[in-house]
Amino acid sequence: NQNETQVTVTDNEEVKNEEVKQDDTASTGTPDLSKMSEADKRAFFAEELKNSAIENQFGKTETIVVNEGTKYQYHMILAFPGTAIASQIEDDATTDATGNVDFTKLMQGAVDNGVISFPQVKSLDFWNYHKGYSEVAAKVLNFLNDGLAGNLE
């Protein structure tokens, strides 16, 4: 009986492996769309969209440490302004087709749109009195990119 059970398990595994080869949804989760009616495609796409939703990124925050480990260390809280505003900030700061970033425009957009939610920075002149402008600029850019990618938690 024990051998019989093992044979059955082996046979079931072989059947399962054969089914996986025949069923293209097993590995990708996407059925063969060419075999679906338009109505079935739309129903599948609607379900797929529902299942792929993420938590709203708007207002998500991240605390950053600037000049960490030095006597000039301070913390800032960044808040995601939403996809449209974050995208506009980045677009306005992108100088050419190669994707070079104008950090003055990036940081001005971040200040103007409340991306730096604490402390309340009103002007780039804040960094006349605090070290770490370029460090903050890089962290702001990474934060906006993470939000645009839907990766903020």
Predicted regions and their residues:
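Short, surface-exposed, charged amphipathic helix/loop patches that serve as local interaction elements
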Residues: 17-24, 32-38, 42-44, 56, ...
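N-terminal acidic, proline/glycine-rich, low-complexity intrinsically disordered segments
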Residues: 1-16
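Short acidic, Pro/Gly- and aromatic-enriched capping/linker segments at domain boundaries
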Residues: 49-67
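Charge-rich, low-complexity terminal tails
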Residues: 1-5, 42-47
